[in-house]
Regions:
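Bacterial N-terminal signal peptides
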Residues: 11-21
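Di-metal (Zn2+ and/or Mg2+/Mn2+) metal-binding site signature of metallo-dependent hydrolases
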Residues: 62-102
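Bacterial N-terminal signal peptides that target proteins for export
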Residues: 2-12
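Sec/Tat signal peptide C-region and signal peptidase I cleavage site
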Residues: 23-27
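Core dinuclear metal-dependent hydrolase active-site scaffold
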Residues: 28-68, 72, 101-164, 180, ...
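A short helix->loop->beta-strand "cap" motif at the edges of active sites that frequently abuts
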Residues: 54, 90-96, 193-196
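Cap/insert and terminal regions of metallo-dependent hydrolase folds
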Residues: 154-231
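Structural motif
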Residues: 74, 147-149, 171, 198
Length: 231
């Protein structure tokens, strides 16, 4: 091989090496997209954080960490174990939605909201202790994921409508005090048809009594990463 060919080969190999190093460096520096998370603080108190960092608290009450400033606070009804909004640190533009915002009492229709990329759809929640015009559940849509928080409720025929929404994560009260017990909650899980079913609002009740298909048991205080359904 003459000197000129060796020089060309050297230059080619050098270029390939530099390109490889540059590509590896770019791959290493590419930011990792955070995953959305859900924390079951306790009772019916839930914290959701979207991939973009939007912080949502639902039914704040149970002792826990509310220190991350809220973008959105949702109150399903005004019982004292669901409405402790003052526990949450709030951003200056925090949106607080209570029953007076979400339900039109005259005809029991529901107002929907889109806040910071989170679609908020109130849905029926009721039983003998919670009037249909004074209580809601919520379906939240963000990052291609749907989360259903049932609020305080018993089984309702309207829950069958949730199947059409393709719920990814559903949370059901199970203690049987002012709402349904675990057996009735399992029937609700069948109606809703979510990919994951989680018990909440169980006080001294044993969450092990809630055994639906697709059970996702989240101990109080724990956080899980939320995943989109496989396409």
């Amino acid at each position: 091989m003459n000197k000129q060919k060796r020089l060309r080969l050297f230059c080619l190999l050098t270029a390939i090496l530099l390109l490889s190093v540059s590509s590896s460096s770019l791959a290493a520096e590419a930011p990792v997209q955070p995953k959305p998370t859900l924390t079951l603080i306790g009772h019916a108190s839930v914290k959701i954080k979207t991939a973009d960092g939007v912080v949502i608290y639902i039914d704040p009450y149970y002792p826990g960490d509310y220190s991350e400033e809220a973008d959105i606070i949702l109150v399903s009804h005004e019982h004292s174990d669901h409405n402790k909004v003052n526990l949450c640190k709030q951003k200056a533009d925090c949106v607080v939605l209570r029953v007076s915002d979400t339900i039109n009492k005259k005809d029991v229709t529901y107002n929907t909201f889109d806040v910071k990329g989170v679609a908020i759809q109130p849905v029926p929640a009721a039983n003998k202790n919670h009037k249909i015009d004074s209580s809601t559940g919520f379906v939240l849509t963000f990052d291609g994921i749907k989360v259903y928080h049932a609020g305080d409720t018993s089984k309702l025929t309207q829950m069958a409508d949730l199947q059409a929404l393709s719920i990814d994560y559903a949370l059901f009260p199970i203690d049987g005090k002012y709402n349904m017990n675990a057996a009735e909650a399992m029937a609700c899980a069948v109606l809703a048809g979510a990919r994951h079913n989680t018990p909440m609002h169980y006080f001294e009740a044993d969450p092990a009594g809630f055994t639906p298909e697709n059970l996702l048991l989240i101990p109080y205080g724990d956080t899980v990463e939320l995943e989109k359904a496989a396409e």
